[in-house]
């Protein structure tokens, strides 16, 4: 694998590539498909193991099949392979339909990858692993939002046509043959599975070509945020690199001290003067949902709202309704983000002051960033996973009844520990206790269904073994640091969470 990466690096150093950005010949290199299959390209920075991304590992990479594939690519009159072609029907059909887009996605990522590495080296941004954690967002919000007044909850619109995705890539990739081949892939896939419809978000991809469409969606979101580039250049920022796709990252925009307007050739993209009256703007995003907060007035936030809507409609032909951007006052509103209901709460305090022989009481209020876990979205996720009914009553997981007892307990315990680990930042743990109760009782009902017994008999037979599996090691360690009474209200953020659990409703 190191030899393949060394050969690829040698190709990237060719002057012709630097001048013309000619990527199309890479499609005929065997090592590209090997790198794409096991995600060797930039795997240490950007990607999780293959099994975590939902790829089918049964189709092993075959050098002979790849050589035949490249030979047929050379023989094609058009720059695409039809899935209905009789030469590709058979046991290797799924391999062809998956390998070509995966290899092509790896090729398309090369210019962005080189640009990202060079920018990290130029700006001397340290690659701290704890910045990859999703929980690293919340300490930033806790530090900043308590001083702000308004928050804007934004849903980034998804493209309504495949051609829009290609138009956004033209400014980044100057290789016409590669873009033409990508257009063929998109139209073929659009005809196969009707990928993008008015009822489904583009973020829901088929597992076959997940890497390619994740790349396209992330490049689309990156372009939608281009209006905020001027904030990024003039702000102190902190990057959290997501391991799912390298363009999907979370930017932390800190306080802006000096803001300079950069002239642009396109007069329509010139930012209005009212943008710079209040430079204190904070922005954070995860996938297609972003939060923008500021100390500015409600009128200025509304101007931001309509500017974003018009910007997306005029320059990206995206139909973004103003109702997708909600503006609320932080002191009276909580916003849902990454599975937490976050807001700023006023905590009353009574301070006793004494001056000489006179003493008096002072009533004051302190703003505090508060995060809680809403119970109903979590129960809704458990209902979809068939752990309980709509009323929150635990039911047995019938599809797991054929597994061994230890396997069933381990599965339920793993889910419970992960949910507790992710929601450890909640200031109120009552909802988590209810989720743990549902999972424990669902586990007991599953075991009772398997052995045709009762829940009481199962709990009596297993005893403490059933309870110990649902306790986390972190809970035992933290209990030594904080007292039990304080632990119920203490927020704990872990810096090792790089992905959201499937049961966490974050959209």
From Swiss-Prot:
The keyword Chloroplast applies. Its main location: plastid. It is found in: Plastid, Chloroplast. Pfam families: Intron_maturas2, MatK_N. One of its GO terms (biological process) is mRNA processing. GO terms for molecular function: RNA binding. Keywords: Chloroplast, mRNA processing, Plastid, RNA-binding, tRNA processing. The keyword RNA-binding applies. GO terms for cellular component: chloroplast. PANTHER family: MATURASE K (PTHR34811:SF1). HAMAP family: MatK. Belongs to the intron maturase 2 family. MatK subfamily. Usually encoded in the trnK tRNA gene intron. Probably assists in splicing its own and other chloroplast group II introns. This is Maturase K. The lineage of its organism: Eukaryota, Viridiplantae, Streptophyta, Embryophyta, Tracheophyta. The gene is matK.
